[in-house]
């Protein structure tokens, strides 16, 4: 096979390596491709899609579900075609939809069966193929290849894959080359490992084969259930494509995200991070729910960034000479103005201190439970709460029991509360940090567990007074930082009037912890050099696309070897709880996924405190920076599913949701499990009607277990490993 690439000379590398600009939001300019009557990429809006969960052979049910999906906001609808029978029935589904007046482009989802893909490509507007299982194998074998043998394997795949490419070219059918982290072939795994690089190379092999056939009507995806892996893979894909003169549109999605708020937050972390990078031309949010509930979530995420484009932020060309668009033209580059005010700090290319392709937490020196190797803390703003009633703290994870005069702490107990200038009329739980404005803190008679937060101006004044011998109120160097854990075990008790005593927890001039609130877009540069070793920064931004500002600030700290801990703060005016959670997950998740942030603070005065607290812990869980509950990796269901995924997921959750830190995969069929659940500790996978196979990691423990006894046998496996806890 001779590989050729589009003509046009050497491509221009993106300023941000994987995105047009690290300082401002602007979209990566992709080639426009045609999917039926509805093009994707180029200057088109972000397209929304989902996938049916009906049996593809049930024409009427599939048509009616497709119509519901269209009405919920889907631009495209994907339907599974696991065999020739289902592929052939796509014609009947399409005919019925057209007769009812629905011209929605249909996408055939193919795994394992090239003949079904070739049939579907003649019938529908687009086919999705998985390079990990289209012509390769997955047996979890470690294979060794010489360079000659590896090339021979590529030649074999080329011969098996190119008939589909030729059919797509003949019929005007688009193709998605969709890599899944969990279904990388043994060949790729053996050569590149279970890595984002392996995911990228798996797709690039197929892209090059398509280009060898002069077929360019492609879009690409890099899906994983692990948000860190997913984000890294997409970024690496774009950088790799640009180096080879490619700019294919991207299909974004976090696979097996789960259900409910957890699934939405996890999807928003992964998809939102990439949208903030300017990447993404179509979105599918994978929830273990009916597919019509997915499109509104995807639409809400896309809308946050499309508003930015309407306000003047455009797209930038990926290369000086991009491959021609679908109509043969080359789109012109747009120089976006950006929405946010310019930060005093800008990034010129990817700095040496920061890699967007691997997770490395920013190095900080711990102050009490903040920073270092400790999990990020959660800070809640409770100024607007009823500070005469201790019961409101249940929303923050502290349940007050009047008869016992005690607090019981849940696994979602926040670490700090921001009081501002407000004073409570009751004793807060021992160990719960209280943060007051500096002027209010100075007047407190009892400063136990109470810490000041300074404005930039106040801090510089105090530091100057301290250095001049004026005796700053709080900033005298401490003899040592206090230590106590960032998270509390469920069921722990605290008396509201008899707090646990920790060494040195009185905030006096001889102790350390204090906070300095800084605006990422406007702060005195001299402030950073004045920071005391016991200071913690609260970094906020009012910019719509504040991720770029906050990231630039933290990279600046890295470059100047300033290892001060930092809490990320964002303000939200929304009154819609669902939109708030999605926005916060996208904004904070993007930074936490890159290793930035030692805590988070979400200020949302119109959102219930319990929602803010749950979202905060959910974001940390989704970014895998702080685990506070059981994690479920459950697929969104499709026509291949062998049991009711929604019902089964809820049933398993009800029995296991107290197993903090355990990851359980629930997979409807063998396509994504066991591969996609390789990140899980345990797996529950449908392998036949009424039959379940149970896994410990990648290892099959029990095959073909009858469904009624499968959960109890899974619990037995967890118990054997010493990981079971009675409720």
Where are these regions (language model features)?
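Structural preference for beta-strand elements that scaffold enzyme active sites
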Residues: 45-49, 76-78, 103-107, 126-128, ...
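Glycine-rich phosphate-binding active-site loops on the catalytic face of alpha/beta enzymes
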Residues: 75, 126-140, 279-291, 596-609, ...
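Active-site beta->alpha loop and helix N-cap motifs at the rims of alpha/beta catalytic domains
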Residues: 74-205, 381-389, 393-470, 504-547
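Catalytic alpha/beta core domains of metabolic enzymes, predominantly
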Residues: 145-157, 189-317, 335-352, 358, ...
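N-terminal amphipathic alpha-helix/helix-capping segment at the start of soluble metabolic enzymes
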Residues: 2-50, 169, 310-314, 338-390, ...
């Amino acid at each position: 096979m001779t590989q050729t690439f589009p003509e046009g000379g050497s491509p221009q590398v993106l300023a941000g390596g994987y995105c047009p600009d690290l300082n401002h939001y602007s979209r990566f300019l992709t080639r426009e491709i045609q999917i039926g009557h509805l093009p994707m990429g180029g200057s088109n809006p972000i397209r929304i899609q989902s996938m049916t969960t009906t049996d593809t052979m049930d024409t009427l049910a599939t048509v009616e579900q497709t119509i519901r999906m269209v009405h919920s906001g889907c631009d495209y609808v994907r339907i599974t075609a696991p065999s020739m029978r289902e592929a052939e029935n796509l014609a009947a589904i399409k005919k019925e939809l057209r007769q009812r007046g629905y011209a929605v482009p249909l996408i055939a989802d193919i795994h394992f069966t090239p003949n079904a893909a070739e049939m579907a490509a003649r019938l529908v507007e687009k086919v999705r193929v998985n390079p990990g299982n289209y012509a390769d194998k997955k047996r979890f074998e470690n294979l060794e290849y010489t360079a000659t043998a590896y090339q021979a394997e590529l030649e074999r795949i080329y011969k098996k894959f190119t008939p589909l490419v030729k059919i797509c070219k003949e019929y005007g059918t688009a193709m998605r080359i969709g890599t899944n982290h969990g279904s990388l072939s043994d060949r790729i795994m053996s050569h590149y490992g279970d890595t984002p690089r392996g995911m990228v190379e798996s797709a690039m092999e197929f892209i090059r084969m398509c280009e060898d056939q002069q077929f360019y009507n492609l879009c690409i995806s890099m899906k994983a259930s692990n948000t860190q892996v997913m984000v890294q893979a997409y970024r690496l894909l774009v950088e790799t494509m640009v180096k080879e003169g490619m700019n294919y549109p991207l299909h974004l999605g976090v696979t097996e995200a789960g259900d409910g708020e957890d699934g939405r937050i996890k999807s928003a972390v992964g998809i939102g991070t990439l949208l903030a990078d300017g990447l993404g031309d179509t979105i599918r949010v994978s929830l273990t729910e009916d597919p019509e509930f997915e499109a509104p979530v995807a639409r809400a995420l896309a809308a946050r960034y499309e508003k930015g484009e309407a306000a003047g932020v455009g797209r930038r060309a990926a290369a000086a000479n991009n491959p021609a668009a679908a109509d043969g033209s080359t789109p012109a580059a747009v120089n976006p103005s950006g929405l946010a005010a310019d930060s005093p700090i800008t990034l010129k290319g990817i700095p040496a201190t920061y890699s967007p392709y691997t997770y490395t937490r920013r190095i900080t020196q711990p102050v009490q439970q903040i920073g270092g190797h400790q999990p990020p803390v959660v800070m809640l703003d409770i100024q607007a709460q009823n500070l005469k009633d201790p019961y409101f703290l249940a929303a923050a994870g502290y349940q007050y029991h009047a008869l016992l005069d005690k607090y019981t702490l849940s696994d979602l107990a926040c670490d700090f509360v921001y009081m501002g200038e407000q004073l409570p009329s009751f004793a807060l739980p021992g160990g719960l940090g209280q943060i007051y404005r500096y002027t209010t803190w100075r007047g407190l008679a009892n400063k136990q567990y109470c810490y000041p937060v300074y404005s930039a101006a106040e801090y510089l004044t105090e530091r100057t007074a301290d250095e001049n011998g004026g005796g700053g109120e709080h900033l005298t160097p401490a003899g040592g930082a206090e230590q106590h854990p960032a998270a509390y075990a469920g069921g722990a008790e605290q008396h509201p009037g008899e707090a646990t005593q920790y060494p040195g927890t009185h905030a006096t001039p001889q102790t350390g912890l204090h906070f300095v609130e800084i605006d990422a877009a406007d702060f005195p540069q001299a402030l950073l050099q004045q920071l005391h070793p016991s200071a913690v920064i609260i970094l906020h931004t009012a910019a719509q696309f504040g991720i770029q500002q906050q990231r630039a600030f933290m990279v600046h700290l890295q470059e100047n070897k300033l290892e001060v801990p930092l809490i990320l703060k964002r303000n939200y005016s929304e009154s819609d709880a669902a939109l708030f959670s999605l926005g916060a997950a996208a904004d904070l998740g993007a930074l936490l996924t890159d290793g930035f942030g030692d805590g988070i603070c979400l200020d949302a005065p119109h959102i219930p405190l319990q929602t803010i607290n749950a979202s905060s812990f959910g974001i940390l869980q989704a970014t895998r920076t702080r685990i506070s509950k059981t994690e479920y990796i459950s697929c969104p269901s499709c026509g291949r599913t062998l049991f009711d995924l929604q019902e089964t997921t809820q049933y398993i959750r009800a029995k296991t949701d107290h197993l903090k830190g355990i990851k359980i995969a629930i997979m409807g069929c063998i396509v994504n499990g066991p591969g996609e659940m390789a990140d899980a500790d345990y797996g529950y996978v449908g392998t036949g009607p009424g039959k379940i196979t149970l896994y410990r990691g990648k290892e099959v423990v029990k095959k073909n277990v009858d469904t009624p006894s499968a959960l109890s046998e899974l619990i037995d496996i967890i118990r054997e490993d010493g990981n079971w806890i009675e409720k």
